[in-house]
Amino acid sequence: MLSQVATPDECLRCGACCAHFRVSFYWAEAELMEEHLVEPLTPVYSCMRGTNQPEPRCQALTGEIGKEVGCSIYAVRSSTCREVQIADEQCNKARLAHQLIPLIQVSPADSENDHDYDQVS
């Protein structure tokens, strides 16, 4: 399967996770969020408005998926949003659903030349 190396700013171009999953969280996390962006699910859980439907898209998501996006509540986003990490399973599942190439994470140690091999000069 084709994949690409994740860059630090990849999330600013993607946004697929914000338009693929229901973003539910413990109700108290919503206290710092704008009220119109949150809807109750159960007595103890809430979700981001726009994500509890067949074709979810978080109302806090701005921009165009795969081009340039942002989160209007990034500083106070839920723990659910914070858990999704670039190039993890959830990230790539959402990217594939939006016809975006999956990402791979390359650690700096893995990307350095292997000392067992001759370097091309």
Curated annotation (Swiss-Prot):
Cystine pairs: none
Coiled-coil region: none
Keyword field: Electron transport, Iron, Iron-sulfur, Metal-binding, Transport
InterPro entries cross-referenced by the UniProt entry: Puta_zinc/iron-chelating_dom (IPR005358)
Molecular-function annotations in GO: iron-sulfur cluster binding; metal ion binding
Membership in a protein family: To E.coli YkgJ.
Protein name as annotated: Putative ferredoxin
Lineage, broadest ranks: Bacteria, Pseudomonadati, Pseudomonadota, Gammaproteobacteria, Moraxellales
